[in-house]
């Protein structure tokens, strides 16, 4: 993962953790957890691609990796919709900027995971 993506994840997670969204803070914590999970999954796919011969290892270690890949894309789509919803309802400029950057990052990560998965197939 390039250093810009790493710092983007860290920055967004830090800023999201500082937000107070009232009764929806549980939802925000869930989003933060999913962002962290997505980052770890993206990192592991990237490492597998860098080793290129790791496809067999990946398949042996987890025969359901394609199913997991599909689940990750569903999570990304859910996060995109959730971030879009938050963006529509917030009037706080700090939150708007954070959610816009989170949305941009989700699109970038979705594309990177797609690219990695095609290289592994």
UniProtKB/Swiss-Prot annotation:
UniProt cross-references to Pfam families, sorted A to Z: Flu_NS2
Domain of life: Viruses
InterPro entries: Flu_NS2
Chain location of the short sequence motif Nuclear export signal per the record: 12-21, 85-94
Cited SUPFAM superfamilies: Nonstructural protein ns2, Nep, M1-binding domain (SSF101156)
Keywords for the protein's UniProt record, in alphabetical order: Host nucleus, Host-virus interaction, Transport, Virion
UniProt subcellular location: Virion; Host nucleus
Cellular-component GO terms for this entry: host cell nucleus; virion component
Positions of disulphide bridges: none
Subunit structure comment from the entry: Interacts with protein M1. May interact with host nucleoporin RAB/HRB and exportin XPO1/CRM1.
Function: Mediates the nuclear export of encapsidated genomic RNAs (ribonucleoproteins, RNPs). Acts as an adapter between viral RNPs complexes and the nuclear export machinery of the cell. Possesses no intrinsic RNA-binding activity, but includes a C-terminal M1-binding domain. This domain is believed to allow recognition of RNPs bound to the protein M1.
Record protein name field: Nuclear export protein
Annotated gene: NS
């Amino acid at each position: 993962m390039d250093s810009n993506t790493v710092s983007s994840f860290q920055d967004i997670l830090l800023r999201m953790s500082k937000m107070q969204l009232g009764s929806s803070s549980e939802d925000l914590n869930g989003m933060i957890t999913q962002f962290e999970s997505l980052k770890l999954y993206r990192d592991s796919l990237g490492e597998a691609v860098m080793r290129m011969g790791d496809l067999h290892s990946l398949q042996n270690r987890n025969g359901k990796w394609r199913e997991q890949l599909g689940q990750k894309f569903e999570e990304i789509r859910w996060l995109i919709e959730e971030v879009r919803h938050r963006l529509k309802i917030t009037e706080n400029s700090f939150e708007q900027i954070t959610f816009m950057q989170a949305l941009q990052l989700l699109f970038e990560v979705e594309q990177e995971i797609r690219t990695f998965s095609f290289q592994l197939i």
